[in-house]
Amino acid sequence: MKKILLTFLMLFASLSFAGEPEMGVNFDKTAQIVPTDNKDKIEVTELFWYGCIHCYQMDPILGDWVKKLPKDVYFKRMPAIPRPDWAPMARAFYAMDTLGVGEKLHTAIFDAVHKDRTLNPSDEKAILQWVTLKSGLDRKKVEDAFNSFSMNASLNKAAQTFRASGATGVPTLMIDGRYITSSTMAGGNNESLQIADFIINNVRKDRNKK
């Protein structure tokens, strides 16, 4: 009897999620339309923070999903800056990208914060030292990247994008600069990716009608 009941509950759960996602529940419109980098593709942006444990847990799942994306979908990460103490890790993200070590150190910096607990995500001096050590690059070169002329513009854009998205937390996925979903809205990490797939398919259908 217990086995039958468990089977029924699992079936019910799968059927309840199989229904079409609801606007305002599982996903929502962005507060403002956010311009995308690539007009020819459907852009998916992950808004995240290296200091966020939920982003850390989401990262390997998201990575597997990104590998399977069709050619008409473009994925990128953008650091979220809803408050000043998130800025040091955003600065690290852009500096590592400029130095060409972004992909190499992406998982490592997450691990340093959450697994090893050897890096304070709000301590800019410690973060700069970590990037210098792990990249093997000259400290002056790393400092120049952290304080480059374009850095403030990148940080301002990231902060503006987070506000325009209407996101209230991270990780949040923004699709086509017009829709957002998250594990909180969708009911889990895998579910948020299913919602993202749903939105991507609808955006594709709308584009094909034009």
PLM feature spans:
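A structure-centric signal for secondary-structure junctions around beta-strands
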Residues: 39-41, 89, 169-170
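Structural alpha/beta surface segment adjacent to cysteine/selenocysteine redox centers
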Residues: 50, 57-129, 198-206
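Alpha-helix N-cap/helix-start motif
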Residues: 55, 85-86, 120, 155, ...
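Extracytoplasmic thiol/disulfide redox context detector
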Residues: 2-84, 159, 163-164, 201-210
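Periplasmic c-type cytochrome electron-transfer domains
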Residues: 20-30, 119-125, 195
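C-terminal cap of thioredoxin/glutaredoxin-like
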Residues: 4-5, 133-210
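A short structural micro-motif
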Residues: 14, 112-115, 148-152
